[in-house]
């Protein structure tokens, strides 16, 4: 009898992102669901699509009654609530259900950008200097310009625009106020590393071919992956951003980038697969910008593109993700083993 796999995902619904024009990042999960379903069917699995909607108690009951041998976790959190992304692996762990991808602890740690950066620093991994600031604490600013101002607990580049990069006090005040008002709480301000930009996907314990992001933008537009660069095809950022995979880099650069990606993967306690985003600073030093557990794996995304470059093909990529989860069956309960000492909630 064929093994039954449940693809668990968040059913797109109205959310706070609708009013900010950022809803496309939420609905994109459906593209991943369709592609993963097709790949799993090709691999001979019996597939059940399992969309989840709030409230948490009812969603937990759905997971507990799946009757599947494996949960393929594509859940990104309920709409407008990225902090709920850890919900599915947490319930699966409680019920001893095998699931793909990262544990809930890693998802929660990576989403809180300051806690993640502290963890990376504890593990000896370079990341841009940073502060948490609100409109009331701007007087404490101590970093060097240019800086980038980000929401503290968002993913998918929510809240990132061309104006997010600031070079003076007036612009800093404006962006901190915008982020604090639009996304709640304090803003993450970090020194902007504006050199070459790379990302690498870790699959199991293997680092896939590195990608480099290139920019062909008008003068004065900061080189960074804004929300528009990822989700708005008609925007200058989308049209002016490109990806080279495999990146044209030396063997030494490949070794450095891949080693940093794997170290970051382990530092955050990831399992299965994750993408690590990195940039060079003005001195040519590689800095980790972000660790993305369970990144978007729709065809054409960074992780899928790197799997293609590795010769896996999309179906082979999904097969490797399943194999990484199956490996955990022999190591139950799932391990959460980030490096470094305990950290505060900052």
Model region roles, listed by residue range:
Residues 1-98, 105, 109-111, 134-139, ...:
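ATP-binding N-terminal substructure of ATP-dependent carboxylate-amine bond-forming enzymes
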Residues 2-9, 64-67, 107-196:
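Active-site nucleotide/adenylate-binding loops and adjacent lid/helix of ATP-dependent enzymes
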Residues 3-5, 72, 148, 199-205, ...:
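A short beta-strand motif that forms the metal-chelation/ATP-contact edge
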Residues 14-18, 155-158, 234-237, 299-300:
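Short acidic/His/Gly/Ser-rich catalytic and metal-binding motifs that mark active-site loops
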Residues 20-26, 161-166, 304-306:
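Short glycine-enriched, charge-decorated loop/helix-capping segments at active-site entrances
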Residues 47, 98-99, 127, 147, ...:
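Hydrophobic beta-strand scaffold residues
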Residues 119, 124, 248-346:
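ATP-dependent carboxylate activation and anion-phosphoryl transfer catalytic cores
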Residues 169-259, 280-287:
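Phosphate-binding site of ATP-dependent enzymes
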């Amino acid at each position: 009898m064929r093994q039954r796999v449940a693809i668990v995902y968040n059913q797109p619904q109205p959310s706070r992102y609708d009013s900010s024009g950022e809803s496309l990042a939420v609905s994109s999960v459906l593209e991943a669901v369709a592609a993963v379903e097709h790949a799993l069917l090709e691999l001979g699995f019996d597939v059940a699509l399992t969309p989840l909607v709030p409230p948490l108690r009812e969603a937990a009951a759905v997971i507990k009654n799946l009757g599947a041998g494996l949960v393929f976790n594509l859940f990104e959190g309920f709409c407008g609530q990225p902090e709920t992304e850890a919900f599915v692996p947490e319930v699966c762990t409680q019920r001893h259900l095998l699931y793909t991808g990262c544990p809930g602890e890693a998802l929660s740690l990576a989403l809180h950008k300051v806690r993640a950066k502290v963890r990376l620093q504890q593990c000896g991994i370079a990341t841009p200097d940073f502060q948490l600031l609100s409109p009331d604490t701007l007087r404490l600013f101590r970093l060097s310009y240019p800086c980038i101002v980000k929401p503290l607990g968002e993913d998918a580049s929510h809240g990132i625009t061309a104006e997010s990069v600031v070079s003076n006090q007036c612009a800093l005040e404006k962006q901190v106020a915008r982020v604090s008002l639009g996304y709640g709480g304090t803003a993450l301000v970090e020194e902007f590393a504006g050199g070459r930009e790379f990302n690498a996907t870790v699959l199991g314990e293997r680092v896939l071919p590195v990608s480099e992001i290139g920019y062909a933008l008008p003068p004065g537009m900061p080189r960074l992956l804004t929300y528009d660069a990822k989700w708005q095809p008609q925007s200058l950022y989308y049209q002016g951003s490109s990806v080279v995979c495999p990146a044209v880099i030396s063997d030494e650069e490949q070794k450095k980038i891949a080693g940093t990606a794997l170290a970051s993967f382990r530092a955050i306690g990831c399992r299965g697969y994750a993408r690590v985003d990195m940039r060079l600073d003005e001195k040519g030093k590689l800095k980790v910008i972000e660790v993305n557990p369970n990144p978007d794996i729709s065809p054409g995304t960074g992780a899928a593109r790197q799997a293609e470059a590795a010769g896996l093909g999309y179906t082979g990529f999904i097969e490797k993700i399943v194999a990484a989860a199956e490996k955990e069956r022999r190591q139950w309960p799932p391990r959460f083993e980030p490096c470094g000492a305990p950290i505060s909630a900052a």
